[in-house]
Amino acid sequence: MGRLRRIGLGLLVLVVVLVAWEPTRVAFQTAMLLPNLLDAGPKPLNLFSAAPVRASFPYRAAQPGEEPDLAELWLPAWASAERPAGAMLLVFGVNNLGRNHPGIERVADGLARTGVAVLVPDSHTLLEGRLEVGEIDGVVRAFQLLAARPEVDRERLGIVGFSVGGSLALLAAGDPRISPQVRWVNAFGAFADASTYLAAVSAHAYPGTDGEPVAWTPTLLAREVYVRFMLDQVDDRDDRDALDAAFSERIFAGERLVRDLAVRGALETDAARTVHDLFTAPSLDAAIGSIGELPSDSLRFIDAISPGRHVEGLSADVYLMHETADHHVPFVESRELASVHEQAGLLREHTEFRLFDHVQPDDLDLIAAAPELVKLLLHVRQLLEESL
């Protein structure tokens, strides 16, 4: 409780500084929203705003015998067809916690109290820890549902994506079905290229500014998603089971593997041998080389989910955020996204923090975190200026 009070006091000071520095309505609203986003200190927004209106809707058809994917809509209490609100679509990543998780509800509730309509889609595929190309279409369909609401102002529509959801958000925003309506996209902790991301998880390293590898330890979740994805590239069941038995648990434990000639020699397919070589790659360059040897279908999939390769069709303003100590996705992935979108004339802001555990607030000392909180305030304010 003492820590929360200190953070609350610190946030109050930041509120005063921000509003005094730039006393605009949006600056004040941003400052009031921040405690809700960080779940820290008193939350004055809850005291001086009406509770949002909330409802669930299916946003894409289900396969026969399956339940449809649902999205949660949060509307400001005052929103109506006569007084529409700007809106945000929140897209979460692989193995996300779902639209009813308290942390997600807190963020959606705070945004709606601030005056923004919010839609949070759930995806069975992502909740199961899998990523498929069809998830881009899912984001498009969720956006269409949000844009069709009479309480929503179609001139003030944006997408906020977290982690893999940020990559999906950038790809969906370029889809011709919705690209004319997407005013802005904010990607937080996204990857630019699935091949460099997979190689980083394999090699426990990412490329530094001088081109030399920088040691990096991916999280258990990152390793689990990586292993699941790579095993899915092996069609032969016996080969897939052999790779799973030989390597999965060791990768989950964080072990750096070496080539196992006995396992490799028993594999029947080229795809399985390539996955073996990736699992046991001795360096970042070797991992990148192994990815290039994957089957053509796998390479097409990697291309399809890599937003850094698909800027065409995107006309929205692009905002990027990343934690510099991120162990889910290396922060250099957002730097690559920034470079690509700046060249395309789309980048509006790229902010790096030392404040979060991937995309969730970290447990930091307030004094050390104060400059990062200021950066967060300024970044979020820009998004609210697009929406309010």
Features from the language model and the residues they span:
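Catalytic nucleophile-loop/oxyanion-hole region of alpha/beta-hydrolase
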Residues: 99-107, 120-158, 168, 173-176, ...
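Primarily recognizes the serine-hydrolase "nucleophile elbow" in alpha/beta-hydrolase
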Residues: 141-225
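Short beta-strand/loop motif that positions the catalytic acidic residue
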Residues: 314, 320-322, 326
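C-terminal catalytic histidine-bearing segment of alpha/beta-hydrolase fold enzymes
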Residues: 199, 263-304, 308, 335-339, ...
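N-terminal targeting or regulatory segments adjacent to alpha/beta-hydrolase or S9 domains
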Residues: 1-53, 236-267, 386-388
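N-terminal cap/lid segment of alpha/beta-hydrolase-fold proteins
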Residues: 29-86
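Short, surface-exposed "cap/lid" segments of acyl-processing enzymes
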Residues: 78-110, 122-123
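Accessory cap/linker subdomain of secreted extracellular hydrolases
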Residues: 188-309
